[in-house]
């Protein structure tokens, strides 16, 4: 199967690493060569860490990297069997990408999106192949997290679903069958919890460290909600909260003002080195 990933950010890089590590040839598509170089450097760094820790041999790293190619040109994707879009969480941008891919790619190409909350059906509406559009939602950090939410839109075919579901197993992931709903399963539960933690912190109920420690020890979570928000990206948390509120119209999904203020200040978490915690230290 010929595979491509669109997007060279944290998720795109992780998806590429995961497929290549399992022996799949995968093409990384990004807008600029600079973005590709940055992504490949990150991939090399991550693989080097695994070699240093003794988990892989140097030859294994070289073999994995040999499975990765790259391009800045959409034309190079026209013969792909499956394309996974992992670009910014913006409906208009995703629809533009899918419209272009639909016009460019062969008829049987499956178009998957790594969206964390947006409607698969609406994304598919920008194409003439809604039966071949599907959600394939990975979790960060992709190489470590076992789950993939496989989300069918209203018109996604069983053949498309089965193909992606089985492919997910082939890369050592555990796929779950999810019907389309805002936030799907994990983020519909998780993101409002993070938003609630933001509110508790803003109200002065406890410090950020105490909130995170309380959830780790009291709820057996491996990471506290504020630290997790920093890992996910507070801009992503805000975007998902806004989707949930827009789709359901329920005030329980209202993003906390502090969350919005931090995003406006570009305090997004690990990706900007500052969020609820300072990562410059």
UniProtKB/Swiss-Prot annotation:
Site (Important for catalytic activity) residue list: 137
Pathway membership, UniProt: Lipid metabolism; butanoate metabolism
Molecular-function GO term, any one: 3-hydroxybutyryl-CoA dehydrogenase activity
Alphabetical keyword list: Fatty acid metabolism, Lipid metabolism, NADP, Oxidoreductase
EC class of the enzyme, as a word: oxidoreductase
Coiled coil: none
TM regions (residue ranges): none
InterPro entries: 3-OHacyl-CoA_DH, 3-OHacyl-CoA_DH_CS, 3-OHacyl-CoA_DH_NAD-bd, 3HC_DH_C, 6-PGluconate_DH-like_C_sf, 6PGD_dom2, NAD(P)-bd_dom_sf
Single GO BP term: fatty acid beta-oxidation
Enzyme Commission number(s) from the entry: 1.1.1.157
Keyword Phosphoprotein carried by entry: no
Reaction equations catalysed: (3S)-3-hydroxybutanoyl-CoA + NADP(+) = acetoacetyl-CoA + NADPH + H(+)
Family per similarity comment: Belongs to the 3-hydroxyacyl-CoA dehydrogenase family.
Protein name (database record): 3-hydroxybutyryl-CoA dehydrogenase
Organism expressing this protein natively: Clostridioides difficile (Peptoclostridium difficile)
């Amino acid at each position: 199967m010929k595979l491509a990933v669109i997007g060279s950010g944290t998720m795109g890089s992780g998806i590429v690493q995961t497929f290549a590590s399992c022996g799949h040839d995968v093409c990384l598509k990004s807008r600029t060569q600079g973005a590709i170089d940055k992504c490949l450097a990150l991939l090399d760094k991550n693989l080097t860490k695994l070699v240093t820790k003794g988990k892989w041999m140097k030859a294994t790293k070289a073999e994995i990297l040999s499975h990765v190619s790259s391009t800045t040109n959409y034309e190079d994707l026209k013969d792909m069997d499956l394309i996974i879009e992992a670009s910014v969480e913006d409906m208009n941008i995703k629809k533009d990408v899918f419209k272009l891919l639909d016009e460019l790619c062969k008829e049987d190409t499956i178009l998957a999106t790594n969206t964390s909350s947006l409607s698969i059906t609406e994304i598919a509406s920008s194409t003439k192949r809604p039966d071949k559009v599907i959600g394939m939602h990975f979790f960060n950090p992709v190489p470590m997290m076992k789950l993939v939410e496989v989300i069918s839109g209203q018109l996604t075919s069983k053949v498309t679903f089965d193909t992606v579901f089985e492919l997910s197993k082939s890369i050592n992931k555990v796929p779950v069958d999810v019907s389309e709903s805002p936030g799907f399963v994990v983020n519909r539960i998780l993101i409002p919890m993070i938003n609630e933690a933001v509110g508790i912190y803003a109200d002065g109920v406890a410090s950020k460290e105490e909130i995170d420690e309380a959830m780790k020890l009291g709820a057996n979570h491996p990471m506290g909600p504020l630290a997790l928000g920093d890992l996910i990206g507070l801009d992503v948390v805000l975007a998902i909260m806004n989707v949930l509120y827009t789709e359901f119209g329920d005030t329980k999904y209202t993003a906390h003002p502090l969350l919005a203020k931090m995003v406006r200040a570009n305090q997004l978490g690990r990706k900007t080195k500052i969020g609820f915690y300072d990562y410059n230290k």
